[in-house]
């Protein structure tokens, strides 16, 4: 793999002077270095984590021609150049192919290979993340995080300088505390080099979610826990630590660190306030965790054995050499707060109004008289006009509702079957009654953006943002621009996912 220049780093203390002579506040990895526990891996799609870093943050690949480009900070130590991504990806889709390591060690994260579990992509690889699934702003500047859907994962099984055996290390990640599930396992950190489960104590990674198969904290979750392999741990007990609270800050700082027979969990609101310690003590009281047998691979969004059931959103994170002090981590947290993470719009293009009734017309040349409709639970396209029957007009009419899982997006309720919504199931769109579950809410939430073919809107799945409303043989799917399903075919994709929205027929 050819990698670009620019991976040099500057080690500074409280402040760094960059080439222009401008005084720049220390980044997280500068702070860790000054504390004697330097970063050995530093990953972020949103910003530079060293004050002098000007190299690439991540790479995107576009669907139109397979070309790639690297996205760098706007300036040394700065926020990602999201405008460069937006320009490169205009009128097509983009995936995040590489998350570069800013530490200089080359510990880049790429598409995770198959392991104990296979991913959904060709040859058992995991999916890559959409480049636009997690927009944010940092100090008012737009950037994109990494939105992990089940099946998506990144990995490096040949990392350099990461902790092995019982060696000390620390790690933090900034996550979306509202995006999680109970699947295994949304992790960031140290894992097996074989992508298989090699036994207790062979991992040390941050976990976030509400899985209760192993450990848990207080309340109903989600929790920050440590994935130490064959267990998600909230403390010394293999089960519950009441001191590990449920946390759902929109921006969440999560910390795990470990050294011989001592480890800790810490957390905070990444937008304000200071860190709290949720656990600090001995290793779990089960065999295999003291001493640890860490292997030093790096994972994001998956379990050590490539378990792919989890979801979450990652903005930035690092791994260190040595066990960071609380004081060092407190300074890192202050830096994260100063970055001023904030939400950004999830939609673009023609606006929708909650409570309005709409119809959606296909724009593919074959099908411009066809509208998105349903026949029972099947969502399809049908030829509809002003002279159509009242029943057909109603089948092709939809009420716009606030997104059931995220009110920044939308859900679409059937006009003739109130209480039933368009949702995806196995990536087939269907009309289903709202059963009130978190899964239904997520599967029925969609985010319109400017139409990929320049007409109307393309309607993106909120929880699988690589996937869009697509008509294929007149049936509706949540389809990606290329993939393993027949309905993911790249031919006419932009046309098939672009819809002109109008006032409803009924």
UniProtKB/Swiss-Prot annotation:
Catalytic activity: Hydrolysis of terminal non-reducing alpha-L-arabinofuranoside residues in alpha-L-arabinosides
Site (Cis-peptide bond): 184-185
Localization, UniProt: Secreted
Top enzyme category: hydrolase
Residues of the signal peptide: 1-26
Keyword Hydrolase: yes
InterPro entries per record: A-L-arabinofuranosidase_B_cat (IPR015289), ABFB (IPR038964), AbfB_ABD (IPR007934), AbfB_ABD_sf (IPR036195), ConA-like_dom_sf (IPR013320)
Keyword annotations: Carbohydrate metabolism, Disulfide bond, Glycoprotein, Glycosidase, Hydrolase, Polysaccharide degradation, Secreted, Signal, Xylan degradation
Span list, region ABD: 344-506
EC numbers: 3.2.1.55
Gene Ontology annotations of biological process type: arabinan catabolic process; arabinose metabolic process; L-arabinose metabolic process; pectin catabolic process; xylan catabolic process
Disulfide bond residue pairs: 29-39, 89-94, 184-185, 409-447
GO cellular component terms listed in the entry, alphabetical order: extracellular region
Domain of life where this protein originates: Eukaryota
Residue sites binding substrate per the record: 227, 230, 304, 424, 427, 443, 471, 476, 496
Molecular functions per Gene Ontology: alpha-L-arabinofuranosidase activity
Keyword Cell inner membrane: no
Described purpose of this protein according to its UniProt entry: Alpha-L-arabinofuranosidase involved in the degradation of arabinoxylan, a major component of plant hemicellulose. Able to hydrolyze 1,5-, 1,3- and 1,2-alpha-linkages not only in L-arabinofuranosyl oligosaccharides, but also in polysaccharides containing terminal non-reducing L-arabinofuranoses in side chains, like L-arabinan, arabinogalactan and arabinoxylan.
Protein name: Probable alpha-L-arabinofuranosidase B
Organism encoding this protein: Aspergillus terreus (strain NIH 2624 / FGSC A1156)
């Amino acid at each position: 793999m050819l990698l670009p220049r620019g991976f040099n780093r500057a080690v500074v203390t409280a402040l760094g002077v960059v080439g222009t002579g401008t005084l720049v506040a220390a980044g997280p990895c500068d702070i860790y270095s000054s504390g004697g526990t330097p970063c050995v891996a530093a990953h972020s799609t949103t910003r530079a984590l060293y004050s002098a870093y000007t190299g690439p943050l991540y790479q995107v690949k576009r669907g139109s021609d397979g070309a790639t480009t690297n996205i760098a900070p706007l300036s040394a130590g700065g926020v990602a150049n999201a405008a460069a991504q937006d320009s490169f990806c205009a009128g097509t889709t983009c995936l995040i192919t590489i998350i570069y390591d800013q530490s200089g060690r080359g510990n880049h994260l790429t598409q995770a290979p198959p392991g104990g579990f296979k991913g959904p992509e060709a040859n058992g690889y995991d999916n890559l993340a959409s480049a636009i699934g997690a927009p944010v702003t940092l100090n008012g500047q737009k950037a994109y995080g990494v939105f992990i859907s089940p099946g998506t994962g990144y990995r490096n099984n040949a990392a350099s300088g990461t902790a092995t055996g019982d060696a000390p290390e620390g790690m933090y990640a900034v996550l979306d505390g509202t995006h999680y599930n109970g699947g295994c396992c949304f992790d960031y950190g140290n894992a097996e080099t074989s992508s298989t489960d090699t036994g207790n104590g062979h991992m040390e990674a941050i976990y976030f979610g509400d899985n209760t198969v192993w450990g848990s904290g207080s309340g109903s979750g989600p929790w920050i826990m440590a994935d130490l392999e064959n267990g998600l741990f909230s403390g010394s007990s293999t089960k519950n630590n009441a001191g590990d609270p449920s946390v759902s800050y929109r921006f969440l700082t999560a910390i795990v660190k470990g050294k011989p027979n001592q480890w800790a969990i810490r957390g905070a609101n990444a937008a304000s306030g200071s860190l709290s310690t949720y656990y600090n003590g001995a290793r779990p009281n089960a065999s295999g965790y003291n001493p640890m047998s860490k292997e030093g691979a790096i994972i994001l969004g998956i379990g050590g054995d490539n378990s792919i059931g989890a979801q979450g959103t990652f903005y930035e994170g690092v791994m260190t050499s040595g066990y960071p002090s609380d004081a060092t981590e407190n300074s890192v947290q202050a830096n994260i707060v100063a970055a001023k993470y904030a939400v950004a719009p999830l939609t673009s293009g023609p606006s929708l109004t909650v409570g309005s009734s709409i119809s959606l017309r296909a724009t593919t040349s074959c099908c411009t008289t066809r509208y998105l409709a349903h026949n029972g639970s099947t969502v399809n396209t049908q030829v509809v006009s002003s002279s159509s029957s009242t029943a057909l007009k109603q089948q092709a009419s939809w009420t716009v509702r606030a997104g059931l899982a995220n009110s920044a997006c939308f859900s679409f309720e059937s006009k003739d079957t109130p209480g039933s919504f368009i949702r995806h199931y196995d990536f087939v769109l269907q009309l289903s009654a709202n059963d009130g579950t978190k899964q239904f809410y997520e599967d029925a939430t969609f985010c319109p953006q400017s139409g990929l073919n320049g007409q109307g809107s393309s309607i993106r799945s909120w929880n699988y943002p690589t996937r869009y409303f697509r008509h294929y043989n007149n049936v509706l799917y949540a389809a990606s621009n290329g993939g393993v399903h027949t309905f993911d075919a790249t031919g006419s994709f932009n046309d098939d996912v672009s819809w002109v929205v109008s006032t409803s027929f009924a």
